[in-house]
């Protein structure tokens, strides 16, 4: 049986994600962000609820990306996720994209020219953000064209780069429905942005989200729930440069901006520059929130849930892979577990996110 990996956030899970799972082949393993997202935001609903939604709509296994993989720039996010999926035996990687191109060809380009491409990046001025630099790199070395807002396409390029030397088949699937950032409700396949914007519209949510009750009946989290914690961390921290990726310039800008900022958007707008993108600033503010310092990654893979078919695959891997199905006295990943504890502080109804939790199990009627 073909084993297909999918890297996702499911923030939240919606009909477009269901379409991706239905279109992908074989047994589907999801490497999913935990309770904080790649762009530096708390998850709308917790990782366990999102895992359950995925497993009820086509996923066979859901594993958790550690904090220092989840909350990273596209290249590090892709590299960390693909490394985990390769340990779980994937043969191909499926992903949605605005532009279906020959990503397999791009793997070969990077395998042949990685040194030149990396050297080229270092020649570009620091006035360009890292995403702008990587786009220029792909334009020069592979003739890739960029038009408008295509975050999934850009992430696809990171997947190609991270897949070099790994013998993975990339399977791009054309993104259907609304654009990534669209807030338009007039789509059967509405975007996650639109769903987050219109959470109070039950009719819209029920048509846009499979198993919508799981979304509606659980706490909805945003930066608003954590801004006071963040403000305290910034004002009381003796040395922000001890936080991951915070340099002297950013520390100074953040310390000044927090004194006049009433919410996260105002703070991000005040700190961001052409060099420091808003997404990068949000990630750094997330690092400050959870007091993240030098990144370390766990050896084990945390299993959030599986179907009967997924369980059969995991049994084959158990002896050769460090699979974590329950976090107890022995920690899995200290940083992720600390981030989970802070996530819980945002709402009294968020249950324990780490200790004692066991995987969600969805029984398949058939194991074909």
Swiss-Prot record:
Superkingdom, taxonomy of origin: Bacteria
Record keywords: ATP-binding, Cytoplasm, Ligase, Nucleotide-binding, RNA-binding, tRNA processing, tRNA-binding
Places the protein is found: Cytoplasm
Gene3D superfamilies the UniProt entry points to: HUPs
GO biological process: tRNA modification
Residues bound to ATP: 7-20, 96, 152, 175
SUPFAM superfamilies from the UniProt entry: Nucleotidylyl transferase
Enzyme Commission (EC) number: 6.3.4.-
InterPro entries according to UniProt: Rossmann-like_a/b/a_fold, tRNA(Met)_cyd_acetate_ligase
A Gene Ontology molecular function term of the record: ligase activity, forming carbon-nitrogen bonds
A GO cellular component entry from the record: cytoplasm
Pfam families per the UniProt record, alphabetical: HIGH_NTase1
Presence of keyword RNA-binding: yes
Catalytic activity: cytidine(34) in elongator tRNA(Met) + acetate + ATP = N(4)-acetylcytidine(34) in elongator tRNA(Met) + AMP + diphosphate
NCBIfam families from the UniProt entry: PRK13670.1
PANTHER family: TRNA(MET) CYTIDINE ACETATE LIGASE
Family to which this protein belongs: Belongs to the TmcAL family.
Primary role: Catalyzes the formation of N(4)-acetylcytidine (ac(4)C) at the wobble position of elongator tRNA(Met), using acetate and ATP as substrates. First activates an acetate ion to form acetyladenylate (Ac-AMP) and then transfers the acetyl group to tRNA to form ac(4)C34.
The name this protein goes by in its record: tRNA(Met) cytidine acetate ligase
Organism encoding this protein: Streptococcus pyogenes serotype M1
């Amino acid at each position: 049986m073909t084993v297909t990996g999918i890297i996702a956030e499911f923030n939240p899970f919606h009909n477009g994600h269901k379409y991706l799972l239905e279109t992908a082949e074989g047994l589907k393993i999801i490497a999913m962000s935990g309770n904080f997202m790649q762009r530096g935001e708390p998850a709308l609903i917790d990782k366990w609820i999102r895992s359950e939604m995925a497993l009820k709509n086509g996923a066979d296994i859901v594993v958790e990306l550690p904090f220092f993989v989840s909350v990273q720039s596209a290249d590090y996010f892709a590299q960390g996720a693909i490394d985990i999926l390769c340990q779980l035996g994937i043969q191909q990687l499926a992903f949605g994209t605005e532009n279906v191109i020959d990503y397999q060809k791009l793997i070969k380009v990077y395998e042949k020219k990685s040194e030149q491409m990396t050297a080229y990046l270092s020649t570009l001025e620091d006035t360009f953000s890292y995403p702008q630099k990587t786009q220029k790199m792909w334009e020069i070395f592979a003739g890739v064209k960029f038009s408008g807002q295509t975050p999934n396409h850009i992430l696809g390029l990171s997947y190609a780069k991270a897949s070099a030397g790994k013998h993975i088949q990339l399977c791009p699937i054309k993104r259907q429905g609304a654009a990534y950032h669209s807030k338009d409700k007039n789509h059967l396949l509405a975007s996650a942005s639109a769903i987050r914007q219109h959470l109070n519209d039950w009719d819209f949510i029920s048509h846009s989200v499979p198993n919508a009750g799981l979304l509606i009946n659980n706490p909805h989290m945003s930066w608003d729930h954590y801004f006071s914690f963040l403000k305290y961390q910034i004002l009381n921290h003796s040395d922000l440069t001890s936080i991951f990726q915070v340099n002297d310039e950013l520390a100074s800008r953040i310390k000044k901006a927090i004194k006049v900022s009433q919410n996260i958007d105002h703070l991000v707008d005040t700190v961001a520059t052409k060099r420091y993108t808003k997404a990068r600033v949000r990630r750094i503010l997330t690092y400050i929130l959870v007091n993240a310092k030098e990144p370390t990654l766990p050896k084990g893979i945390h299993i959030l849930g599986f179907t009967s078919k997924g369980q059969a695959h995991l049994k084959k891997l158990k002896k050769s892979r460090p699979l974590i199905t329950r976090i107890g006295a022995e920690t899995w990943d200290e940083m992720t577990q600390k981030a989970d504890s802070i996530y819980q502080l945002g709402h009294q109804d968020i249950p324990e996110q780490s200790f004692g939790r066991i995987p969600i199990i969805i029984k398949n009627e058939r194991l074909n």
